[in-house]
């Protein structure tokens, strides 16, 4: 469905939650190193429960390694950032899109963030004066909005059945 990219995630339970989300939504998860934890971390595994076997998780040595090996279409890469100009609710997502999220404590590195055209830097609306949402919550909000726009294709949702 969609490609979720976590660039240098730091907190094991957040990644575990995203693994579970990927399994339940049919997304592929890309983890860009360095990771702030071991993939065997008990907190990450607990958050992902037994969903690891149902999620497609790929690891990449760096942001450039992901770009070189996966070759995502430049026009379908979206950076989720508090520095975003547009809202995830204003973007029209397509199956196969790449949804890119930065580290919990610092977001995307400036060089990665600045490599995205301003129109592809998106944010989730928040109340004024708030810094950011939790990473796994932001991923969930974004993925479900993208999936909703595509009729929850592949799910048991009635909208998905209407498309068949």
From Swiss-Prot:
Record's subcellular location: Cytoplasm
Annotated signal peptide: none
Transmembrane segments: none
Pfam families named among the record's database cross-references: SpoU_methylase
Alphabetic keyword roster: Cytoplasm, Methyltransferase, S-adenosyl-L-methionine, Transferase, tRNA processing
Domain of life where this protein originates: Bacteria
Binding site for S-adenosyl-L-methionine: 80, 102, 124, 132
Reactions catalysed: cytidine(34) in tRNA + S-adenosyl-L-methionine = 2'-O-methylcytidine(34) in tRNA + S-adenosyl-L-homocysteine + H(+); 5-carboxymethylaminomethyluridine(34) in tRNA(Leu) + S-adenosyl-L-methionine = 5-carboxymethylaminomethyl-2'-O-methyluridine(34) in tRNA(Leu) + S-adenosyl-L-homocysteine + H(+)
E.C. numbers: 2.1.1.207
MF terms in GO: RNA binding; tRNA (5-carboxymethylaminomethyluridine(34)-2'-O)-methyltransferase activity; tRNA (cytidine(34)-2'-O)-methyltransferase activity
One GO cellular component term noted in the UniProt record for this chain: cytoplasm
Bridged cysteine pairs (disulfide): none
Xref: InterPro entries: Alpha/beta_knot_MTases, SpoU_MeTrfase, TrmL, tRNA_m1G_MTases_N
Any GO BP: wobble position cytosine ribose methylation
Subunit structure as annotated in this protein's UniProt entry: Homodimer.
Main function: Methylates the ribose at the nucleotide 34 wobble position in the two leucyl isoacceptors tRNA(Leu)(CmAA) and tRNA(Leu)(cmnm5UmAA). Catalyzes the methyl transfer from S-adenosyl-L-methionine to the 2'-OH of the wobble nucleotide.
Family under the similarity heading: Belongs to the class IV-like SAM-binding methyltransferase superfamily. RNA methyltransferase TrmH family. TrmL subfamily.
Protein name: tRNA (cytidine(34)-2'-O)-methyltransferase
């Amino acid at each position: 469905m969609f490609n979720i990219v976590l660039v240098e995630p730091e907190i094991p339970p957040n990644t575990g939650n995203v693994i579970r989300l990927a399994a339940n939504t049919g997304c592929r998860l890309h983890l860009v190193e360095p990771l702030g934890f071991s993939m065997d971390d008990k907190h990450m595994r607990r958050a992902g429960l037994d969903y690891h076997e149902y999620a497609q998780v790929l690891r990449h040595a760096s942001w450039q390694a992901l770009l070189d090996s996966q070759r995502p279409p430049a026009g379908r890469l979206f950076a989720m950032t508090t520095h975003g100009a547009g809202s995830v609710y204003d973007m029209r997502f397509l199956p196969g899109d790449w949804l890119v999220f930065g580290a919990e404590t610092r977001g995307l590195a400036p060089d990665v963030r600045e490599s995205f055209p301003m129109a592809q830097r998106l944010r989730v609306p928040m109340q004024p004066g708030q810094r950011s949402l939790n990473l796994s919550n932001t991923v969930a909000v974004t993925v479900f909005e993208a999936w909703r726009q595509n009729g929850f294709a592949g799910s048991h949702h009635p909208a998905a059945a209407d498309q068949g």
